[in-house]
């Protein structure tokens, strides 16, 4: 799937930014190598992502794919810095994936 960019507006940015995570950090995580899984939200198909920023901060994100003018864009729904338990899970998943790739 080719993603053309991000879908930011006055609806999603305030919700993402209220926990102190910047747009740049959110984009770094989603463009990096996050662990991505389905989100159980009942109303619309959403995804969860956990990953690290270039500065090494761990971020938890909820996002969805939006088609705008025939282009697929990532629309962040919410973002926050991860708790230690989530960081431990993320690092464990990275190790499992690294071993599987060998």
Feature locations, PLM:
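Ribonuclease/tRNase effector modules and their secretory precursors
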Residues: 1-102
């Amino acid at each position: 799937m080719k993603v053309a960019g991000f879908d930011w507006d006055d609806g999603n940015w305030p919700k993402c930014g209220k926990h102190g995570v910047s747009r740049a950090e959110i984009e770094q995580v989603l463009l990096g190598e996050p662990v991505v899984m389905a989100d159980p939200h009942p109303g619309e198909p959403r995804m969860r992502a956990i990953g690290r920023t270039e500065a090494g901060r761990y971020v938890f994100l909820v996002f969805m794919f939006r088609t705008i003018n025939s282009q697929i864009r990532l629309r962040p729904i919410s973002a926050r810095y991860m708790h230690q338990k989530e960081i431990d899970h993320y690092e464990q998943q990275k190790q499992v994936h690294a071993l599987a790739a060998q």
